[in-house]
Amino acid sequence: MGKITELKALFANLSKDANKLAQRLALSSRSLKGLKDPRFRKAFNELKSAGLIKIEKSLETKPTPLFGEKLRREIRRHLISDKAHFSKNFYRFYFAFIAPKIEQISEFSDKDKEQFLSSLKLERFFCLPFELVCADFLSHKLGVLRSSISSYWDKDCEIDILVQSSSFCLAAEVKYKEHIVSKKLLNELVAKCEKIGIKPDFYALFSKSGFSGELINLAKKSPKLLLFELNDFKDIL
């Protein structure tokens, strides 16, 4: 009960709208595209001022029309959307799982707490932290600035990690799943890169649960394909 009271006090100054928005961002795509309502823009600024969230800028750029050319209506109307990141994983965990049920949790017995914790869909929650750790790993492994690593998204596709240094480009996909990753993921990554018009020097795949034999054999033959599992992260621990 004491710890729940402490949590309530920690976020007591947040408005109802700010709490609602934080809960939405905690388990959503984190896109800020829908923040047209002045109330939610105010709530977003409140979360930002409180140091709870920060912005990841989109790498998407709008096409420049040629002289005399008129872009299609859907392209003209398309709004490039940034994304929100919680400044700490704890904040995201709190708003994803604790805040929506904080009043009930304060009355939980020990057994209720165990059942509540076992019911949480943590695999979905851990996808983003794992993706960020993979980006840190690549910064260390490749000797590039962390600021040169980001994710890419537009209205049609999303690439988990994109490294754009002065000497090379790398595109990567990250899977925090309980099953091995197959060549299908690589094919999808290659197709995404072709769609947005980039030609990476390297492709990287990260998997919590390993890779298919086909992918492993392919990586042995191609220096352009890099495969990373949990054991590879020992270097940065």
Q: What are these model-predicted stretches?
A:
Residues G2-D154:
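Accessory nucleic acid-recognition modules appended to NTPase machines
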Residues S81-L237:
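A cross-kingdom feature that marks ATP-driven nucleic-acid transaction machinery
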